[in-house]
Regions:
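Secretory targeting and sorting signals
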Residues: 1-28
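Extended, low-complexity, turn-rich repeat/linker tracts enriched in Gly/Pro/Ser/Thr and Asp/Glu
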Residues: 496, 509-511, 522-530, 612-615, ...
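Extracellular beta-strand-rich recognition modules
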Residues: 515-523, 601-609, 638
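Extracellular carbohydrate recognition
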Residues: 529-531, 610-628
C-alpha cells in the first residue's frame, strides 16, 4: 500500500459531561473505583501490513513547517492505553531517579506472577441490517488519496459480513504466500491460538510448504498469546480467557467502519447516524452479550486496578471496569485492503469507549478495548495487547518515514513476523520489558569503570546472565527558549494532558483612554487543539472572560469571533473564545486592551488548556507591562520571583502536572543507551521470518522473507526529548542532521541497501533504496556476517511483476562507540545534496548537546571531503559526522568480546560516559 498515515480523532463531547477541575486523591478505603474520563480516551491503529514508500524530504535547510502536519496527525495516535501508560511513565521516572529497575519496586507491592483474564468477544455483523448508505461520500479504495472519492447511489444498503466468508488464499488466481487462513474461525480456534500452551496443532495453508521441514502446511503449534507473554515476562505475567461468540452485532460492519471522503485510510467514522464510529462496536457487543446471557459472569473479568484508581499501589484488585476487552470482527481488516468490505471495513486498533460505558444490568463498565480481524494471527493480538498494557508504537506511525526498529520489536513490525503472517511474533525490546518490570538490565552511570558483562539472550534468558545493559547519560538541560530578558520567564509546562492551569494576579487598572496590558509571548501550542487565554475577572474570580490579544501592530492574534473551532476544543474547554494557538516562531510583543476596565480592580490570568496525547512546549511569557496612554505604570521582568503572581493547577479530568512555573528556558531530559542480545530462540525465531512485500492486490499477497541478523547485540538509544518515533520533523534538530525519536536502534550497517540491475531501472525513486524493513535487517552488532537476502519490486503500472535484487552478506560489526556516526548522512548526486537514507538508524548525542558535523559522502559511500566545512544553514556544517573527530563524544562504548556457547548470550565490554 502506498499511503498509511494517521487519522485525527476527536473525543466525543459526551465524554466531558460532568468532568471536574480537580485531580483524584488516594482514598482511605481499600476499595478501588475507576471512573474512565476523557483523558483515558485514545485510538491507536495496528501497523500497516505493507510498508509504505515514504516521500524523501527536501534538502536540509528547507521549510520544516511544511512537514508539521505529519507530526500533529501522528502524535495523537502513537501512544498506548493512557491509564496504563501513566503508570509506566511514572515507573520509568522513579527508576531513573533512584537508579533502580522498575522490577525492584513493582514486585515489592504485588506478587510476581500475574494472570490477566481477557474478555474475548467474536463479533459478526447483521446480514439483514440494510444500513442505508445512499448518497454517502466515501473513499474509493483503502489506498485512495483523501480526495479520491465515490458517492454511493440511491438504494445502497449494507449488510454483514458473517464469519467464515474470507476466501481461501490458495484459490486466488495470483500467488499468495503470506496470508493467514483457516477453514473455520471458530471459538475453539481462537481459544487454542490465544489461551493454550499447544496452540493450533493442525498445519495451516497446506498449499504452501513449511520452510523449516519442507512439508505441506505451516506448523504454528506452540505459538500462542499465553506462551508469548509468559516467555517475554520470564513467567511473571500470563493471560487466560475464553472466546465468546460469534455474537451478532445489530448493524453491518459498514455502520462502524465506513471511511468518509477526505479522510485517511484508517478512518472509521462510520455511518453518519453513528457518532462513535468503530467505538460503538464495543458497546453493541456487550449489549448483545448482556441481553443473550443475563447471567454472564462479568465480575470474573475485573481482577485488576489498572490505573491504581485509589492510589494504594495495589494493582491486583477490582476497580469496577472490565480489565481487558478483546474484540474480533468478522471479515478482513481494512489494513489489508478490507476484503469484500473495502473501505467499509474496520481497521485493527486499540482504543477506549469515551467516558466508559456501563454494562446493562450491572454496576460494571467497559473502557479500554482492542479489536482485530477474523483472520488475525497471534501477532496482532500480542501487539494490540501491548497497547492495552500502556506501551506506545515504536514504528513511524505518520507514514512519512520508517523508524529503525521494524521487526526487532513487537511494538513495531515484530507483530507481523513468522513463516506465515503474524504466526511467530518477535519479542518486545528491552525498554518495553524494562518499564513493565520484566527485565532488569545492568546499570552503568557516568564515571563508572569500564566493565565486562555477560548478557544473556532476550528470550529464555539463561541463569547467571544479565538481561541487558543500561548506560545512563548525564541528565542534560534542554534549551527550549532564551528568556526575553534576564534569566527567567513564566512557563505553562508541557507535562499534563487535559490541563487547565493558570497564573494570575490582581491589577489596579489606572484611569486612561488607552490602557494596555503588555507581555512578550513565545509559545508552541498544538494548533486548533490546545489553547492559551488571557482572562479577566471583575467579581473576585467567580467568573472569567477571555480577552482578545493583539500584536504590537494591532493585529488580533487570538481566534476571531467567526473561528470555526474545527476540533470543537474551545467548546470542550467551556465554550471559550479568543484563544491563542499555534507557534509564534520566537518572541512576540502582544497586548490586551484593558481600557474598558479603567479605574477598576480586576484579576487577570494566563490560562493554558490542553487535550490528550500531544502536548508541545507550551507557553512562555515574560516582561509584563501595564501602560496608560503610552506611559508605563507597572512592570515585571520575572526576575524577582512570583512578585504577586499566583499559579493554580487544574484539570478537566483526572490528570496532574507541574502547572505554571518560573523557568529559565530549559527543561531536564533523560537519555540512556540499552543493549540486549537477540537470538533465534523461542518467539524470537520469528526474526528469521521478517518480510518485504513484492505485491499486494486483488486479494493476493506475495512477499520475500528476510532473515534478521541474529544472534546479535541490539544497541538502543532512548531520548525523552521526543514522545514518539515520528522522524521527519526532527531531522534538522541538534546536534546533527538525521533521525531522532523516543526509542531508536543504532544500525550497525547504516549505509543503505540499494536495488541494482533491472530492479533499479524499474524503481522510480532517486536512490533506489530498499524498504526500511529490509534496511534494518542487519542492524545488530555481531560476531558473524549478515545474511544474504533477496528483495523484489512490483514495477509501477505492471501489476504482479517481480524485479529482484540479491544482496550478499556483509561483514559483522562488533563494536559501538559514540565517537563515530551511525547515520548515513547526505550524499552528493548530480551536483546536489540529498539525504542518503533519511529515516535510517539514529543520531548519537554529544557532550553538552554540542552541534557536530553531518556526514557527507559520494554516491559510492566514499567521503566527499571537498564538501567538509560547508555551512548548509541551520547551524549545520558538513564533515565526517563523527563526534569524536571534534572532541564532542561522551565516551560511551559497547564492544562484543566473545559469544556464549550456543549463542545463548555474549560477553560484552561496557565503557560508560565520562563524568
Amino acid at each position: 500500500m502506498s499511503r498509511k498515515t494517521r487519522l485525527l480523532a476527536t473525543i466525543p463531547a459526551v465524554a466531558l459531561l460532568g468532568a471536574t477541575l480537580t485531580a483524584p486523591t488516594a482514598q482511605a478505603s481499600s476499595v478501588a473505583r475507576y471512573e474512565p474520563g476523557p483523558s483515558d480516551f485514545y485510538i491507536n491503529y495496528a501497523p500497516p501490513r505493507d510498508e509504505a514508500t515514504p516521500e524523501e524530504p527536501g534538502a536540509p535547510g528547507g521549510d520544516k513547517r511544511s512537514r508539521s502536519r505529519a507530526r500533529e496527525i501522528d502524535q495523537k495516535h502513537s501512544l498506548g492505553n493512557p491509564a496504563a501508560a501513566r503508570v509506566l511513565a511514572a515507573r520509568e521516572q522513579e527508576a531513573l531517579r533512584t537508579g533502580r529497575n522498575p522490577a525492584d519496586f513493582i514486585f515489592k507491592k504485588t506478587k510476581q506472577t500475574r494472570t490477566a483474564k481477557l474478555l474475548t468477544l467474536l463479533v459478526e455483523f447483521n446480514e439483514n441490517a440494510d444500513d442505508d448508505f445512499s448518497g454517502y461520500n466515501r473513499l474509493r479504495t483503502v489506498d485512495s488519496a483523501p480526495d479520491d472519492c465515490l458517492v454511493e447511489p440511491a438504494g445502497t444498503l449494507k449488510n454483514g459480513p458473517l464469519h467464515n466468508n474470507i476466501p481461501d488464499p490458495a484459490t486466488l488466481p495470483n500467488k499468495d504466500n503470506n496470508s493467514f487462513w483457516v477453514k473455520d474461525f471458530s471459538p475453539e480456534h481462537f481459544n487454542k491460538m490465544l489461551y493454550t500452551d499447544k496452540g493450533i496443532t493442525e498445519r495451516v495453508r497446506k498449499d504452501l510448504k513449511d520452510p523449516r521441514d519442507g512439508r505441506p502446511g505451516i506448523d504454528i503449534s506452540g505459538f500462542t498469546l499465553k506462551k508469548m507473554y509468559e516467555e517475554m515476562s520470564k513467567g511473571a505475567y500470563s493471560v487466560t480467557g475464553s472466546a465468546v461468540g460469534w455474537i451478532k452485532a445489530p448493524h453491518s460492519e459498514a455502520w462502524y467502519g465506513a471511511a468518509a471522503c477526505g479522510g485517511n485510510p484508517q478512518d472509521m467514522s462510520g455511518h453518519p447516524d453513528n457518532p462513535l464510529g468503530a467505538g460503538q462496536l464495543a458497546i453493541d457487543a456487550v449489549n448483545v452479550l448482556a441481553q443473550t446471557q443475563p447471567d454472564f459472569p462479568w465480575a470474573d473479568y475485573d481482577l485488576e486496578d489498572v490505573s491504581d484508581a485509589d492510589g494504594d499501589g495495589n494493582f491486583a484488585e477490582p476497580d469496577g471496569v472490565i480489565d481487558h476487552l478483546v474484540l474480533v470482527h468478522a471479515g478482513k481488516d481494512k489494513s489489508s485492503d478490507g476484503g469484500a468490505e473495502g473501505t467499509y471495513a474496520i481497521w485493527a486498533h486499540s482504543s477506549a469507549v469515551a467516558g466508559g460505558y456501563q454494562v446493562p444490568g450491572t454496576d460494571m463498565k467497559i473502557s479500554n478495548y482492542i479489536v482485530q480481524p477474523e483472520d488475525s494471527g497471534v501477532g496482532v493480538f500480542a501487539h494490540e495487547y501491548g497497547h492495552d498494557l500502556g506501551l506506545p508504537d515504536l514504528y513511524d506511525t505518520s507514514g512519512a518515514g520508517s523508524s529503525a526498529v521494524d521487526f526487532w520489536d513487537l511494538m513495531s513490525s515484530g507483530s507481523h513476523s513468522g513463516p506465515i503472517f503474524q504466526s511467530m511474533p518477535t519479542h518486545m525490546g528491552l525498554w518495553d520489558k524494562w518499564v513493565l518490570g520484566w527485565a532488569s538490565p545492568k546499570v552503568f552511570d557516568p564515571g563508572d569503570r569500564k566493565s565486562l558483562v555477560t548478557v544473556g539472550q532476550s528470550s529464555r534468558t539463561p541463569k547467571l546472565t544479565q538481561d541487558g545493559v543500561r548506560v545512563n547519560l548525564a541528565s542534560e538541560p534542554l534549551k527550549m527558549v532564551d528568556p526575553h530578558s534576564g534569566g527567567n520567564a513564566w512557563w505553562s509546562g508541557m507535562d499534563q494532558e487535559w490541563a487547565n492551569v493558570s497564573v494570575g494576579r490582581d491589577i489596579d487598572v489606572p484611569a486612561g483612554s488607552d490602557v494596555r496590558f503588555w507581555m512578550w509571548n513565545n509559545y508552541e501550542i498544538e494548533s486548533d487543539w490546545d489553547f492559551g487565554f488571557v482572562e479577566v475577572s471583575t467579581d473576585g474570580g467567580a467568573t472569567w472572560a477571555q480577552q482578545k490579544v493583539f500584536d504590537e501592530a494591532g493585529d488580533e492574534i487570538t481566534t476571531p469571533d467567526d473561528y470555526p473551532d474545527p476540533n470543537k476544543n474551545l467548546a470542550t474547554f467551556g465554550d471559550k473564545k479568543y484563544g491563542i494557538t499555534g507557534d509564534t516562531g520566537g518572541w512576540r510583543h502582544d497586548y490586551v486592551d484593558l481600557t474598558s476596565f479603567a479605574g477598576q480592580s480586576i484579576k487577570l490570568r494566563l490560562t493554558y488548556n490542553t487535550d490528550a496525547a500531544f502536548t508541545p512546549r507550551g507557553w512562555h511569557a515574560d516582561d509584563f507591562e501595564l501602560t496608560s496612554d503610552g506611559a508605563t505604570v507597572w512592570s515585571d521582568d520575572v526576575e524577582g520571583g512570583e512578585n504577586g503572581w499566583r499559579a493554580t493547577g487544574g484539570t478537566f479530568t483526572n490528570t496532574s502536572g507541574q502547572g505554571w512555573t518560573i523557568n529559565n528556558g530549559e527543561r531536564e531530559i533523560q537519555r540512556f543507551y540499552l543493549a540486549e542480545w537477540r537470538n533465534f530462540d523461542g518467539f524470537d525465531k520469528g526474526l528469521q521470518y521478517a518480510y518485504d512485500t513484492t505485491y499486494s492486490r486483488d486479494g493476493a499477497w506475495k512477499v520475500e522473507k528476510v532473515k534478521y541478523n541474529a544472534p546479535g547485540l541490539l544497541v538502543w538509544y532512548r531520548d525523552s526529548t521526543y514522545t514518539n518515533n515520528v522522524l521527519v520533523n526532527n531531522l534538522e534538530a541538534a546536534p546533527s542532521i538525521g533521525s531522532k525519536g523516543t526509542l531508536l536502534l543504532v544500525d550497525s550497517h547504516f549505509d543503505p541497501l540499494r536495488r541494482t540491475g533491472e530492479a533499479a531501472a524499474k524503481d522510480p525513486t532517486r536512490h533506489k533504496n530498499m524498504e526500511g524493513r529490509t534496511q534494518t535487517s542487519n542492524a545488530a552488532f555481531s560476531f558473524r556476517n549478515t545474511y544474504p537476502l533477496k528483495e523484489c519490486l512490483e514495477a509501477p503500472d505492471e501489476p504482479f511483476s517481480e524485479y529482484c535484487t540479491r544482496i550478499g552478506g556483509l561483514k559483522g560489526v562488533k563494536e559501538f562507540t559514540d565517537a563515530k556516526t551511525w547515520y548515513p548522512g547526505l550524499e552528493v548526486q548530480d551536483g546536489g545534496l540529498f539525504y542518503r537514507d533519511f529515516d535510517a538508524s539514529t543520531v548519537v548525542p554529544s557532550k553538552g548537546d554540542q552541534p557536530y558535523s553531518t556526514r557527507v559522502v559520494n554516491v559510492d559511500g566514499t567521503p566527499a571531503t571537498e564538501y567538509y566545512g560547508l555551512d548548509i544553514g541551520g547551524g549545520h556544517v558538513l564533515g565526517s559526522g563523527n563526534p569524536g573527530d571534534e572532541g564532542k563524544a561522551l565516551g560511551v562504548g559497547i564492544k562484543l568480546i566473545s559469544p556464549l556457547p550456543g549463542d545463548l548470550g555474549a560477553i560484552v565490554q561496557v565503557t560508560p560516559p565520562k563524568k
